[in-house]
Amino acid sequence: MIYIGNHVSSSKGYEAMGKQEVALGGDTFAFFTRNPRGGSAKEIKDDDVQRLLTLMKDHSFGPLVAHAPYTMNVCAAKEDIRKFSVEMLKDDIRRMEYLPGAFYNFHPGSHVGQGSEAGIELIAAALNECISGTQSVTILLETMAGKGSEVGRSFEELKEIITGLCGDKKEN
């Protein structure tokens, strides 16, 4: 089955995203988990999510795709930025459990002078810290353009990140 949808605004809540997609004729959608240029996230309201899940069932929706904010950088050189980003990643993965079977897409980040190898190790470490192996979300690493100190500029770098995951994290 092929599902087609759009990237919709999450500003009015989960059910509103679903209704907007139905109005557009789609049967899936992508959305940002939080402010794409910041770190703040709205509180999740159980009843809002339940109404979305009902709408998705009624309209035969496929899996959803959530996109992490662009500011998340789990391999940042500055420890405070890296810690904040890892906490954001943890929170986003936790939040994705409200939408079983969804995909969570994020840009690996920028090593900012540490070198690609260090960046790859930090990204794998962040994922190992955030993934329990019991979550239902599928995590997608998005390729980067490769400018500056971006990590994930090639499939080889993405493979190295995945190789750095603990075995039980990959078996889910």
Where are these regions (language model features)?
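Short, well-ordered coil/turn segments that N-cap beta-strands
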Residues: M1-I4, G25-D27, D58-L64, Y98-A102, ...
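Hydrophobic alpha-helical segments and helix pairs
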Residues: L89-S136
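Conserved, mostly hydrophobic/aromatic
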Residues: E21, H67, S85, M96, ...
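N-terminal pre-domain/capping segments
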Residues: M1-A66, M72, A76-D91
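Histidine-centered active-site/metal-ligand motif
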Residues: H7, H67, H107, H111
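Acidic/histidine-rich catalytic cores of soluble enzymes
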Residues: F29, A124-N172
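Active-site-proximal beta-alpha loop/turn segments in soluble metabolic enzymes
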Residues: N73-V74, N105-S116, I139-V151
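Alpha-helix N-cap and loop-to-helix initiation/capping positions
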Residues: S40-D48, A76-M88, Q114-A125, S149-E160
